[in-house]
Design a protein with these regions (language model features):
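Short coil-to-helix segment of the ABC ATPase nucleotide-binding domain corresponding to the Q-loop/switch region
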Residues: 81-88
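Catalytic Walker B motif of ABC-type/P-loop ATPase nucleotide-binding domains
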Residues: 144-147
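A short, proline-enriched helix->beta-strand linker immediately N-terminal to the Walker B motif
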Residues: 138-142
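ABC ATPase NBD coupling module
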Residues: 48-69
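Conserved ABC ATPase signature
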Residues: 119-129
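Hydrophobic anchor residue at the start of the ABC signature
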Residues: 133
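Conserved ABC ATPase "signature" region
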Residues: 47, 99-115
Length: 209
């Protein structure tokens, strides 16, 4: 795959047909899967490739907790926690205060205030995804990884959520990789993208200008 260099505030979309390795790439960069081979991987000042080579699981877990934020296609909310507690979970795990100005701004921007005391089962799919977006940025990670965040939504709500997510990334100065099968949605925002192409025995990621 081509070399990736993401500046703070930059967003790169990864597109392609189902089953072509988009999510696998995201999970590998998110340190959820171990790569079969790896050249360089740096996240800010951290040499992730060296940590992987040393199999330093403690350090890798710390990177996942502090430097990475995830938005899963399913939302991934814990069903036994209310919305407010789901959002604050990454901060609690790091020993951070539940009070955060940027989290409150994100809650307001995504219109989640009336939902904070509800359990995930009481929310619509779109509402759960909005909660997942706020949770992913609650601890101000360096890199946001979003796997098909709009896949279960109708076109109107998909566009609205995508716009809100990009707004949060811009405001907080994060880097973001967003996997999407919706080329038209990605294109409408003018995002640079990698397109995953299935080839015999491999997946190739091609830069699309």
């Amino acid at each position: 795959m081509p070399e990736l260099n993401l500046a703070r505030g930059a967003v790169l979309a990864i597109t392609g047909e189902s089953g072509c390795g988009k999510s696998t790439l995201l999970e590998t960069l998110g340190l959820l899967l171990a790569p079969e081979a790896l050249g360089q991987y740096r996240l800010g000042n951290q040499d992730i490739a060296a940590l992987l080579a040393a199999d330093d699981q403690v350090a890798l877990a710390d990177v996942r907790a502090r430097s990475l934020g995830f938005v899963l296609q399913s939302g991934g909310l814990l069903p036994f926690l209310k919305v407010r507690d789901n959002i604050n979970l990454p901060r609690r795990l790091l020993g951070l205060s539940n009070k955060s100005a940027h989290v409150e701004r994100a809650i307001d921007a995504l219109h989640l205030g009336p939902l904070l005391d509800k359990l995930p089962q009481a929310l619509s799919i779109g509402e759960r995804q909005r909660v997942a977006c706020v949770r992913a940025i609650a601890h101000q990670p360096q890199l946001l990884l979003a796997d098909e965040p709009t896949a279960a939504l109708d076109p109107h709500n998909a566009r609205q959520l995508f716009e809100l997510l990009l707004g949060l990334v811009d405001e907080l100065g994060l880097s973001a990789l967003v996997v999407s099968h919706d080329w038209s949605l990605v294109g409408s925002f003018g995002l640079p993208r990698l397109n995953a192409v299935n080839l015999p025995g491999e997946t190739r990621f091609e830069t699309v200008h």
